[in-house]
């Protein structure tokens, strides 16, 4: 079974230290909100408050029609486009694209991740430079409704 160290280069996310505490990716998801809150409290002045428990880097662009619920961190040069819906517990890395009508929940997007068109990314960790094709979905629900 692949471990976090097999799958990810932890130098490409603010959550590298947090993820290093775990063996498997799914182990990190249950406490992600607390991780983001702790990271948010340590961010430098380049990150600006954008709402309750939401921090956005000053070089990031967030469309006025995007909806963001905390805890959430949006990294440098990231782009959150029209109609994006971030439901909380989301860490969006540097140079990421959260596209139109994309929904994020309980996720870590490493730097340079692209979720550009009509994606649902929930309970997931996407590694450095990952790209989600249009209309793709990740979730923690199996079609037979049993636990993942």
Q: Where in this protein do the model-derived segments appear?
A:
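A near-ubiquitous, low-amplitude feature marking generic local secondary-structure context
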Residues: 1-2, 11, 15, 61, ...
């Amino acid at each position: 079974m692949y471990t976090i160290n097999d799958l990810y280069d932890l130098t490409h996310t603010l959550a590298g230290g947090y993820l290093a505490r775990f063996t498997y990716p799914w182990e990190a998801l249950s406490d992600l909100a607390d991780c983001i809150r702790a990271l948010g409290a340590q961010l430098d002045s380049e990150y600006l408050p954008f709402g309750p428990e939401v921090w956005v880097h000053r070089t990031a662009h967030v469309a006025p029609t995007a909806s963001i619920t905390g805890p959430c961190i949006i990294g440098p040069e990231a782009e959150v486009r029209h109609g994006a819906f971030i439901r909380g517990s989301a860490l969006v890395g540097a140079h990421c694209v959260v596209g139109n009508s994309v929904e994020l929940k309980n996720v870590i997007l490493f730097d340079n991740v692209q979720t550009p068109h009509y994606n649902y990314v929930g309970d997931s960790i996407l590694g450095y430079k990952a790209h989600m094709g249009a209309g793709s979905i990740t979730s923690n629900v199996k079609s037979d409704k049993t636990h993942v």
